[in-house]
Design a protein with these regions (language model features):
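Conserved glycine-rich beta-strand-loop-beta hairpin in the small C-terminal domain of fold type I
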Residues: 217
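Anion-binding (especially nucleotide phosphate/pyrophosphate-binding) glycine-rich loop
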Residues: 1-64, 203
């Protein structure tokens, strides 16, 4: 709320004096890398914009949301989750450093969800750890210019670009190896819990390709057909891990 008020002051937007109260309710699983905390901030910003009839450009909203989490709540994170929540679509994000410095935000490209391959999501029903724990040491090493971390981040960006190019070209079914490469690289620089690694290995044992959705506790992957999806379900049977097919619109 304070960040919204500060933004309006900066933009010389006069807010009418009227009262409100905010109550939260969420069905997003906690601490499994599904951006539950940022969803609350995003929803609050959206409510404030509607209530006060203030228009904030879509490309600016993720920056504002992240500033709340980083500066007010001390959470180390990036813009990705906030971009998706603001745009509410499938989006390719370019965070090129020069571009970010020049325009103050990334370049966000909407992708037709009809071009996506078959996707599944699996998540743990027991609690994992918060993303602030997962990201803190890596962020610090990146800020310090650790060559290994800087190089890894370049590769993550390259994987995303290659996946985007395949999807836009109508070859979305070919992105599987890029998901595997993403996870393998992440595993090489982060300390991952055995339970989270087990999720990926179970999905791979069924022939699927997958990666974390976020900081751990949930994975997103691709599968070829219903036979493979059923094999994935069997791989997670009796583990307390739920598997579903996301509806992307």
């Amino acid at each position: 709320i304070s960040r919204f008020a500060h933004y309006c002051r900066e933009q010389r937007i006069t807010l009418p004096e009227k009262n409100f109260s905010i109550r939260y309710r969420s069905n997003i699983p906690r601490h499994v890398g599904m951006a539950g905390s940022s969803a609350l901030v995003t929803a609050t910003l959206r409510c404030l914009m509607e209530y006060y009839e203030v228009i904030i450009p879509e490309e600016i909203q993720p920056n504002l949301i992240l500033s709340v989490e980083a500066d007010e709540l001390g959470i180390s994170a990036g813009l990705q989750d906030r971009v998706i929540q603001v745009y509410q679509e499938c989006v390719f994000m370019d965070f090129d450093k020069d571009l970010m410095e020049r325009q103050g935000h990334g370049t966000y490209e909407r992708i037709d969800p009809e071009l996506l391959p078959n996707l599944f999501v699996a998540y743990r029903t027991d609690l994992a750890e918060g993303s602030e724990i997962f990201h803190n040491t890596i962020r610090q090493r990146w800020l310090q210019g650790d060559p290994r971390i800087v190089e890894a981040m370049k590769w993550f960006a390259e994987f995303a670009q290659e996946a985007r190019d395949l999807i836009v070209a109508g070859r979305g079914r070919e992105i599987g190896p890029l998901l595997d490469a993403n996870f393998d690289l992440r595993r090489s620089i982060y300390t991952l819990s055995p339970a989270n690694i087990d999720m990926v290995e179970r999905a791979r044992s069924a022939g699927a390709h997958c990666k974390f959705t976020g900081s751990g506790g949930a994975i997103v992957g691709v599968y070829e057909d219903e036979a493979m999806y059923e094999a994935i379900e069997r791989a997670f049977a009796d583990t307390g891990i739920l598997v579903l097919k996301p509806e992307i619109v």
